[in-house]
Amino acid sequence: CASSYQIHSMTTSTIAALTTHDTTRIDDVRIGAVRPLITPALLEEKLPVPAAAEALVESSRAAISRILQGQDDRLVVVVGPCSIHDHSQAMEYARLLKAQADALSADLLVVMRVYFEKPRTTVGWKGYINDPHLDGSFAMNQGLEMARQLLLDVLDIGLPVATEFLDLLSPQFISDLVTWGAIGARTTESQSHRQLA
């Protein structure tokens, strides 16, 4: 094929010129920095799922399934703040919620709402994963690690968790810890989110 011949016959200097051409005046003009993202496998290796947390996720997913199928008379109640922005406050809330969840367990399956991402129709803080320090630094690797650690800590006290999957990358880092994954109102018409569901 002529086009593959042309590609294969490019000289080293031509290829070097292609890869070093400065397009910063026209490409990604609103991007301040590009940083590598940790892989899900590395984060899971750093913060693995303990057996007790895995068992809780599995049993609470099964319980929700039974409730939705009418095989369990309890109600599923997802309760929690609009979004997470502080680990210690989230854990204080989780401890208080755990006491209520235990007291009401005959009638309710309580799942803590732990939403890390904020859907935005305008500019604004995008959430704990995207900007964990609330300072515009967009330290996403830290945000992903902090989010995963928080989920592990909530599971450790015995509460299942729910979150909204807004960014399609986030589930790869935290879905193994989530009992209930939600697709929000702003993304229900998104084909990629429907495929995720």
Predicted regions and their residues:
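Short, Lys/Arg-enriched N-terminal segments with co-localized hydrophobic residues
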Residues: 1-9
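Active-site-facing alpha/beta catalytic cores
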Residues: 11-27, 107-197
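N- or domain-start disorder-to-order transition segments that initiate the globular core
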Residues: 28-71
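Conserved, mostly hydrophobic/aromatic
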Residues: 80
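Glycine-rich anion/phosphate-binding loops
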Residues: 84-104, 137-149
